[in-house]
């Protein structure tokens, strides 16, 4: 009897050990599974976007999920660089680390990381163009539809892995590119029957002029990153954070003047003494005039001087798209980046 009891206890313990050793099925935070019903809908959206891209003459490319770390860093600002998913070197990489020398995190990262998951599709595209420039006919219109990864804090509408659908033109400085991309947005949302869409537009040159008038040119990147958070934290907290940077409180009235501008005419009185600001204003006027002549099917183009988009590589007009009937933040964005390929 004692022998049988011991066997019973033994098998019970083995069974419990087996149950406890099994891994609970889960996925990392900020990542998602998609069942078949969702995939049918996603594929319909992707096919609609793809068809619109090709109707406008854009050709497809793909780039690797991983890029060399130096390709990605330094393009998105300090905050963006922190959100890059870094990939540890394979093999016994720690054996090559000098613990006495590599004491801070930046030096340690250089020793153990050579690759990273792509943060967006724009910088890999710039790398692709620089690497294949002898085989490309310019102007070059490309589209790319692939996953990107960001080491962000997961929250509603914000994930660590998500899909981007990009269309870019490279090799021309014509502002008709911006006009066409606004029409392309309008085409896609009309085909998808998404109503009440606003395409907000601003220009980095106008932001540059604003910061210049605030006597804070050296803080431009920091101010733009803070301004990019205005929808999340509100204007008063934006002002507080800018003041903490060292901007004189009296200069914040200039910020108010710009944010209160609702039209090209409002801006012209603020920018008439600035060469850079006037150029940005001319670019915006060209785009508004042409969109007014061509018309949009369902979207609305609107000036938003608070629009900053905190990516370092933008040089001209910037865009952000919102579906006003849904509270999920922006559903699209972009802008002009004239000098990005020159870094490669």
Model-derived segments and spans:
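Generic start-of-chain signal for non-secretory N-termini
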Residues: 19-40
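Phosphate-rich ligand and nucleic-acid binding surfaces
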Residues: 33, 212-217
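Acidic, His- and aromatic-enriched active-site or binding-groove loops in soluble protein domains
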Residues: 82-94, 216-237, 323
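Polyanion/phosphate-binding surface patch
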Residues: 65-115
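Short, surface-exposed recognition loops or helix-turn segments adjacent to catalytic cores
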Residues: 196-207, 223, 301-306
